[in-house]
Amino acid sequence: MGLAHYFQGQFAEAAESFRQALALAQNNDSVIDCSNWLYVSLRRAGKTAEATQALRRITPDVKNKEPHLLFYLRLEHFYQGALTEQAVLPPKPADPNDTEAELAFDTVTYGVGNWHLYNGDAKGAAELFRQVAKGNAWNAWGFVGSEVELKRLDPTQR
């Protein structure tokens, strides 16, 4: 339910869903996943102090098992200020059929774009969202989120 609320712009409701999921998290992968979405939901809801607290379980010694969760973990370190934007952003995939590279690019680029958005840089955010929307990983949450945000930023866009 959290992602459904999130992509509909119901950020407080999304945060509550992710807060509940985080309370039930039984391993690092679940903590990493839920913490990321809780953080961005709270930031989008304007609750910066709460968002910072949402990442309290993300410490330098937290490790992921599932490879795709490394993308979220690196984003969380970026949100905490431990990584720079340049360090966290992956290169645009050279091969559009490289699904792992596309997933990494879309996930992290959307996350950094979202960070620009809630820090007042809508133009920078839109540039990053457009890069993601040009890709092929339409089933990645970063791709979905980029299309949603581009529509929110410019409702005349298809």
Which positions does each model-derived feature cover?
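TPR repeat positional signature
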Residues: 35-37, 109, 142, 147
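Residue-level recognition of tetratricopeptide repeat
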Residues: 3, 40-42, 114, 147-148, ...
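Alpha-helical adaptor scaffolds
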Residues: 63-101
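Alpha-helical junction/boundary sensor with strong preference for TPR arrays
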Residues: 25, 62-63, 136
